[in-house]
Amino acid sequence: MTENNRAGAVPLSSILLQMITGYWVTQSLYVAAKLGIADLVADAPKPIEELAAKTGAKAPLLKRVLRTIASIGVFTETEPGIFGITPLAALLRSGTPDSMRPQAIMHGEEQYRAWADVLHNVQTGETAFEKEFGTSYFGYLAKHPEADRVFNEAQAGYTKQVAHAVVDAYDFSPFKTVIDIGAGYGPLLSAILRSQPEARGILFDQPHVAQAAGKRLAEAGVGDRCGTVGGDFFVEVPADGDVYILSLLLHDWDDQRSIEILRNCRRAMPAHGKLLIVELVLPEGEEPFFGKWLDLHMLVLLGAQERTADEFKTLFAASGFALERVLPTASGLSIVEARPI
């Protein structure tokens, strides 16, 4: 008797079917996030007619979406046609410290559409997003402010969730000046500065992002110790930091562009400086790892990639750095530490 035929075993066909239809879940969560359902039921369960009226949806159709995702723990149907919050659904609220609503929206809109062309991407090498939209992903964001805002909110939300794991895994006490390159709204830099009251920071990103980050830094209680600088890391980065942090940045770029960023960091860095890359470092072999899926996502969006430790060594060798160590964190991210040579 095979494993698949034993009483109670889930048929392999059922397992594969669940994988094949995964996009059903993505888009159902997108509907709930986009319509703001979690905000509407945060204080108490609401009837579907009220939810439909407030969101401009058709009540019978919205009910079908909500009852389906309630079956996987996202919302609960407390009585027939009345839906309430659950711990998972609470993550889809707006403006909360642990909100994942921007991520659900981001992955359900342009990024979702790009995945329709992944076969073309694999066969031709043309980035799927560029095939779908006729421009690069960051070029698209530059022309679509709302998509850019959602992207930066999603990035900030994810980084905020993992920042404490990074701070717990690494000793930042030797550094007086911390420079975060491509920092977004600065959740990681804020966490580092809160852990090191004597340190000062510089947040570096595109001018419009750096400008928006000032308010976030003040809200985090570190605005008086952290400056913001707008610029282009392909041209130059702020000089004389004791440590340069590139968190979830190099995976947005191919090797050539990544080396350009690293060389600019090397030129700006004093001899005693450190470089910290915070990313999902790919393990060798077949073990399941979220970073392998993110590697494909970077291919689809940007023609870029996640990397192994050896691939980071190659980048460092071409840009004036030497790998010192790779430190895992509780978040799944790793801290790749390098020194200038």
Curated annotation (Swiss-Prot):
CDD domains: AdoMet_MTases
Entry-linked SUPFAM superfamilies: S-adenosyl-L-methionine-dependent methyltransferases, Winged helix' DNA-binding domain
Coiled coil spans: none
InterPro entries per record: COMT-like (IPR016461), O_MeTrfase_dom (IPR001077), Plant_O-MeTrfase_dimerisation (IPR012967), SAM-dependent_MTases_sf (IPR029063), WH-like_DNA-bd_sf (IPR036388), WH_DNA-bd_sf (IPR036390)
Domain of life the protein comes from: Bacteria
The protein's Enzyme Commission number: 2.1.1.-
UniProt keyword terms in alphabetical order: Methyltransferase, S-adenosyl-L-methionine, Transferase
Assembly and oligomerization: Homodimer.
Function: Involved in the biosynthesis of phenazine natural products including myxin, an N(5),N(10)-dioxide phenazine antiobiotic, which has antimicrobial activity. O-methyltransferase, which converts iodinin (1,6-dihydroxyphenazine N(5),N(10)-dioxide) to myxin (1-hydroxy-6-methoxyphenazine N(5),N(10)-dioxide). Catalyzes both monomethoxy and dimethoxy formation of phenazine natural compounds. Acts on a wide variety of substrates, catalyzing O-methylation of phenazines with non-, mono- or di-N-oxide. Highest activity with 1,6-dihydroxyphenazine (DHP) as substrate.
Protein name: Phenazine O-methyltransferase PhzM
Annotated source species: Lysobacter antibioticus
Source taxonomy: Bacteria, Pseudomonadati, Pseudomonadota, Gammaproteobacteria, Lysobacterales
